[in-house]
């Protein structure tokens, strides 16, 4: 059994403790971009996300969440980054920049911390369409010592609307060619960011499409 294999591995190793984890029934994932700057720590509106084979494909902001979930998610993200920044400052560093905090929302509504990326996050590309300052602008300003306040991370999309980003993944070998760009950009509320990647070898994320819709259904249609 798995338990016996775990015990055998522990007996063969040079450690005396093991970690036993319970099954966490996952419903969905959230990303909370958290910014540490000279003005302190602020959190962005939670971002919903969808993955394929463990890789980002789509994200949207604000995430669709029950009452109170957004604030609980932001509190967890803030606490995690506060701890990281405290360690950085104890080592003589500033700890400034954007942190992508990933969270698990379980089927019972509870929220678990998953991991944190000390940099702009792929799911955060949606902020190029949703916020006053994108995650990239926030990161640059923060590490340059400029203050970041809640006003800097405010959503700028119309009330009740949703912004979304979708990764454009190209399969093949050689140069990538984009077609029908004009038709895609003719749709109101859309944008396209093509990355400066000259070639594809296998599967590679080559661009991201951005859109703003009046609702999550509208976002999906766009």
Regions found by a protein language model. Give the residues of each.
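Active-site nucleotide/adenylate-binding loops and adjacent lid/helix of ATP-dependent enzymes
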Residues: 1-85, 188, 213
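Short, well-ordered beta-strand elements within core beta-sheets of diverse protein domains
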Residues: 22, 126-128, 209-212
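Active-site "cap" helix and flanking loop/linker of ATP-utilizing ligase/carboxylase catalytic domains
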Residues: 71-101, 107, 117-174
């Amino acid at each position: 059994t798995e338990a016996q294999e775990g015990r055998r591995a522990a007996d063969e190793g040079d450690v005396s403790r093991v970690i036993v984890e319970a099954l966490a029934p996952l419903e969905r994932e959230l990303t909370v971009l958290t910014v540490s700057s000279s003005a302190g720590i602020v959190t962005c509106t939670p971002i919903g996300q969808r993955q394929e084979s463990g890789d980002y494909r789509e994200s949207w902001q604000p995430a669709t969440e029950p009452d109170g979930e957004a604030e609980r998610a932001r509190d967890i993200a803030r606490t995690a980054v506060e701890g990281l920044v405290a360690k950085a400052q104890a080592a003589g560093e500033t700890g400034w920049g954007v942190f992508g905090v990933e969270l698990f929302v379980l089927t019972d509504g509870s929220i678990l911390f998953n991991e944190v990326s000390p940099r702009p996050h792929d799911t955060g590309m949606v902020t190029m369409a949703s916020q006053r300052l994108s995650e990239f602008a926030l990161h640059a300003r923060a590490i340059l010592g400029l203050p970041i306040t809640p006003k800097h991370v405010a959503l700028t999309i119309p009330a009740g609307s949703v912004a979304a980003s979708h990764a454009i993944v190209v399969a093949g070998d050689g140069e990538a060619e984009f077609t029908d760009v004009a038709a895609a950009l003719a749709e109101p509320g859309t944008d396209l960011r093509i990355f400066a990647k000259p070639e594809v070898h296998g599967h590679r994320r080559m661009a991201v499409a951005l859109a703003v819709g009046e609702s999550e259904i509208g976002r999906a249609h766009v």
